């Protein structure tokens, strides 16, 4: 029996499950169902916008808890992260949320309840948030709760409270992009690998919210390279969900900024095409590497300027995610992991200069600013 179990587990990791059907003759191969990975966006408040983001490829939104919205989301196959009508902290009154919990907690489209946004910035004590979480759960709420932090290091104080921990970081252009990676790394390392962690990346111009950054004048939207870099820095942690802020908020409406909107659509489409990279497991790896030029070997956050992650997807395939977190061209000299496989740059034929890497040797890999390179492991017979 143990041998059969090990065999089935090996087949499962290869992406196939074999089912013996009574009277069906030989074994039938059935594809493994990919687990749900939220690719979401904030600021979706109407059924019209819901249809628009559905067509764009999003499967999750942050939106209202009302019947018309949730029913439309269910029809489109979209999950909704919704406020219960009150936020944890001062004034968290059951009379404000009890009705919504009764009416919508059972709704199939409800993904989770948005417990509170950035309590660390508002300096709401963790004990109070934890107490309000217990109060909320006591009112028959069965769906998970979500909580958003603005600083990943505060996961040490708030991370154990919600069912789903979310971290936002919006550095463009007033902070180095490497801050995004730093906050996600802090949150993941503190919360641990078992904690559901969602990243929230910037898809807006701070000019629309300029009152929140007094004195800042260098307003602009993230470039496509920056948006892609933040996306894959999140996946490299890895995270269990990825959302973007925001579709519509105040005077901001994302489709009014076509370069950013179409760049985001391109990234969302790429995530669907390479869905095997979603929700990977991070493997232990102490890489041997050098980054040139020497004076650029560290980012503005004093971390390595190229982020390196060794991941394994649900089918057992290994990937190296290598990401330049800076605006500078860099060269990475890297010794690849030796694990009975060769490495190939994803999307490149083996006869290119970066195809067909073999383990155990030092390879020099050039990077443009914010460039993402993914090496895929191929088993050697």
Stretch-by-stretch model annotation:
Residues 15-26:
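Bacterial N-terminal signal peptides
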Residues 1-3, 324:
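A detector of low-complexity, intrinsically disordered, Ser/Thr/Gly/Pro/Ala-rich segments
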